[in-house]
Amino acid sequence: MSETTSSSVFSDNERINVKEYFFKVVRYVGLFAALTIITGVFFYLLKPYYEFWNRKGAVAQCLCVVGFIVLIFVGVYCKKTKEMTPDLLLKLILIAGYLIRLTYMLCTPVSVRQYDTYNRASTGHETYAWIIYSTGKLPATNDYQFYHPPLNAFVQAMFMHVTNGLTEILQKVFGLGDVIPSKYIAAMPKVTDRYYVGLTEYRYYLYSTTQILSVMWSVITMVALVKTLKLFCLKGYTLAAVSAFVVFFPRHIEFAGQVNNDALTYMFQMLSVYYCLRWWKRGRRLYDLLICALCIGLGMMAKISAAVICIPIGCVFAYEFFREIGKAVSAKKNGESGAWKKVGYMAACYVLFLCICAPIGLWFQVYAYKTFGQKLGFVFSNLNGALGTTHHNWFERLFITFDPNEYFGTLYCQTFCTIKDGVTTHYNNYNLPLFQLRSSLFGEFNTYKGGECFSATAFACGLLSLILVFIMLVYCIVLFFKNGKKMLADEPERKNIAFIAIMTASFLISEFMFYIKMPYACTMDFRYVMPVILGFAMIFYYARRRILAANTEFGNALVFVSTFCVAATISLTTLFYLVCSV
């Protein structure tokens, strides 16, 4: 049997070495399997010491600091011995990225800084997974979080079966019955006759093991983002610098400890972007297209809003399709035969794409509609009135506010209004851009202790970064009109910029409309627009490059200050997550 397969339709495709590709897949599977085991080992070794030294999470944080010191020592040593290369630096960054994610998971109980995981009525994400684990069936209602597609809950349920078997071995063979689960129930909600009914210590422990999966989702996303940056033709130390931004972006760290469906959804969104760009830039190979379809379908099976990523991907498909039609028309005029076969082949590939993506991504929507009458795109909206933000006008909520309290009144997100005897005594945060900034750094939580010197400075640098990036974009427009064609990018770069712009705009507009439809503080959370992290990184990279190419005194100063502020924001938030507690 031949070791290569190819398409006879596209001449610029294609030949893939099946053997080489197979071993590459095996290497990645082996790597992530090994990291899962390592993460599990640290989970079982260090979670019992969560409150050691009378400070929550200190042991895990010390471990991470030691790891960072070792990585810095290795980097300095390699630099002095002239063995440092961009590839080695990138590997050190990725290792550090794994370490900070592992540490955050070890420092954060499964009930802390989560989204809709535990609730008093037992209709959150934890109960969703537990129902599948204990019954093998979907919930009988679509209450609260049960309206979501089941992929995240299903994977967690399967993983709990694995950890349940492992626990039985640890208890019976190694005599750890006194340790498990009693040492793994930090921050467990208090069970009463009315609240958290059915929650036991063992159930709480078992679900907490799914944080191991969250670390892996975040790590896989991290790798996918770095590989995507390579597809944008970033190389050398530039690639390492931009990779450091996406690796250490604070919400990526938080996702490593959060067990709702956001991390899994985001992972599949970034994988779909990666395989779409591979298809686009590396010969339009069919298997890249099919993997992209699978990732989109699985993302929608975790959370239907994953479909937003279809907008930039669909634009790529449409662009290539119409470009192929244009080629076929030109070839027909020149008397060439068979030109339309390529168009037909591409159309067939797109149909195959839909045949994979649509059933996987939409079957639950059909099931929920037939079972519960749940409409497509349904979002649970029976929210706590204290989350409402209609106490301020639409302009202040959506664009700019001149209320100093919204800027400086709170460091972290204030999600709920304070209401006493039916009277609001303190309003929550309501401005969308500011809430997005705060939640991009710290989530929508204010349950942090310690590290305020880092978090406060990070917020200030982050706010300044946004202002400076906006000025950079305006300055790029000025340079374009001033220098004309000298500022034009080449065709591949224009395609990259167009894709990034469409992707970023798709999510920001989606979030904008979401907040208009549901004016609550929780709908402003940055977790709904996570793919814009890649967009921001690339927009900053391109703007910085264009301004430096112009070589003006103002532009160079602007680039220096903005780069410093962005680097400071990422560095300070990383330090913050190394020292903060619950």
Where are these regions (language model features)?
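Start-transfer (signal-anchor) and selected internal transmembrane alpha helices
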Residues: 1-107, 210, 321-322, 335-356, ...
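Membrane-interface anchor segments at the N-terminal boundary of transmembrane helices
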Residues: 53-65, 201-218, 418-505, 533
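Interfacial juxtamembrane loops and adjacent helix segments
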Residues: 111-212, 386-453
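Transmembrane-helix signature of polytopic, membrane-embedded enzymes
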Residues: 169, 182-204, 220, 225-248
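Membrane-interface alpha helices of multi-pass inner-membrane proteins
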Residues: 288-304, 309-310
